[in-house]
Regions:
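Serine-hydrolase catalytic core recognition
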Residues: 1-295
């Protein structure tokens, strides 16, 4: 026999014993909802078409507590978008992050879309971004934005975007390629130019700068610094050895030369991800930025 452990969108944990002789399972544990009795957001999952008009993409939506379809809500697109990661799963609350729940309790609507290039959908799905990271991903994310704008309860004048690492790269990419769409963005540990990123990742998906100069030029955000219009906060750890501080600092230098005004916050001594009480401080800062400029 084997032990099978899994989640469902409305069940945090199931455990069953499955017979290897006949495949029949016996449930031995089904976890109760730990949030029973609390006011919680509505978590849902759906699909839209990718920019190629044929590929199905999955999204997660977290609606505010006490949701009223007659109101218009500030909406945050949470994005990662890169290879090797997916955000939307058929697990507990569709794999929603606790920060999404917190923001929904504060009156925001959250939208998370797994664009082409993300993981576990096959080689063709992931390889569409090869040698030009960020480009197809942005097109798919903008399909998500079009979908959001079609909903009567989404305030199209109060759209925000937030992501970390590859998601930080996507956040700045979206804000500089579509400057009239996003009012506020928070980019954490963002890649700015792939030639400065670690080669075991960058060259796997981009080839070398010598073999793919046009791809590196197209995906670099340095030349896009002058396009920035909305409020953008960039956050990094000063000891980040994954996306080294050179990325953010070079982008800030380009912004100063182009006359654009992003905000910048540094965690001294921290790496690519904040840990412990610094993580709490980080999420307070991200939340405050949206409260100040989007809500």
């Amino acid at each position: 026999m084997v032990i099978d452990s899994w989640q469902e969108p409305d069940v945090p944990r199931n455990i069953a014993i499955v017979s290897t002789d006949n495949g029949k399972g016996t449930t031995i544990f089904k976890a109760d909802n730990p949030w029973q009795g609390y006011k919680v957001p509505d978590y849902s999952c759906g699909t839209i078409k990718a920019d190629d008009d044929s590929t199905t993409l999955y999204y997660r939506m977290v609606k505010p507590v006490d949701f009223d379809p007659n109101k218009k809500y500030p909406t945050i697109v949470y994005v990662y978008g890169g290879p090797g990661v997916r955000n939307v799963e058929a697990g507990w609350h569709y794999n929603s992050r606790s920060w999404e729940t917190y923001m929904a309790q504060k009156g925001y609507l959250l939208f998370i879309l797994d664009n082409r290039g993300s993981s576990d959908r096959g080689r063709e799905f992931e390889q569409v971004t090869f040698r030009h990271l960020g480009q197809e991903e942005m097109k798919d994310q903008m399909r998500g934005v079009e979908f959001l704008k079609s909903l009567p309860y989404v305030d199209a004048d109060r759209l925000g975007v937030h992501g970390w690492s590859y998601g930080g790269f996507m956040t700045i990419s979206l804000m500089t390629h579509y400057p009239d769409v996003f009012k506020v963005g928070v980019a954490g540990g963002p890649v700015i130019d792939w030639k400065w990123y670690e080669v075991m990742y960058g060259e796997r998906y981009m080839d070398t700068p010598q073999d793919n100069p046009e791809g590196y030029k197209q995906t670099s955000l340095i030349e896009k610094a002058g396009n920035l219009k909305g409020r953008l906060q960039i956050i990094i750890g000063m000891n980040d050895d994954v996306v080294v501080p050179q990325h953010a600092l070079m982008f800030l230098n380009a912004c100063s030369e182009k006359g654009t005004q992003p905000d910048f916050y540094v965690y001294p001594g921290e790496g690519h991800n904040m840990m412990g009480h610094k993580s709490v401080h980080l999420h307070e800062r991200i939340t405050r930025y949206f409260d100040d400029y989007l809500k």
